[in-house]
Amino acid sequence: MNKERNPFKIVQAQFDHNAEVLGLDPALREFMRNAEREIIVRIPVDMDDGTTKTFTGFRVQHSSARGPAKGGIRFAEEETLDMVRGLAMMMTWKCAVVDIPLGGAKGG
């Protein structure tokens, strides 16, 4: 993946900018930049043509500080861990901004 287009790095940069504006404590800021938990699984699937293909799946729970981690799942062969990380982080902020008592997560 092109480093300049890394979705997780883009979301972290947006967070860093806003954390700077808000004057967040550096230790809290560093904690909030990364996920609480990441799960990577490899699942073998028997295909219709008789072959077996292995798929990699990701589940990222960015934060459960405000409640259970909420977030959907994306089914796409080109899904990446960094995309799922970025989307989970954004789900944390979306829930917090509208005062929904849930954390952020995503799967893919």
List where the protein language model places each region.
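N-terminal ligand-binding/catalytic initiation module
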Residues: 1-108
